[in-house]
Amino acid sequence: VSSISTSTITIGAAGTGGAAVSGSAGSSGVAGGASSWADGTNTITGNGGAQGLSVWANYGNGGLGGTATGGDINIQGCIGGGGWTPKGGDSVLGFGGVWQNYENYATAVATGYGGGGVGGVNSAYSATYGVGRPGTAGIIIVWEYK
């Protein structure tokens, strides 16, 4: 690649965690946005992961990890975990949020870049419900050399 004078860089927005709702399945999260680089010749895209899905009776499903296209190396993000231990999917540069505490159904936020959000926790055995937490935004890293 030579003489790239301009490029368009888009940083994918963080997906949101689903709400916990007493007496129902709660709400599903929102998928993360795509991060991309486009310079007129090359387009490289890291798609955001899919949202986790809320279901009735405690067990939600983790969302699929994001995919990548156009790079020399394209690494897919990890799938999020569901069930009693929900966890947002990890990326190469970030970690997904996680269900943190059984007693009060707390959830911990995602860290780094591209970490998946964690879904809300709904328990049939407790009046306490944990609210989902958002994921983290994507990142574009540019190395210039001559």
List the model feature ranges, each with a label.
Residues 1-146:
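Low-complexity, glycine/proline-biased repetitive segments and flexible coils/loops
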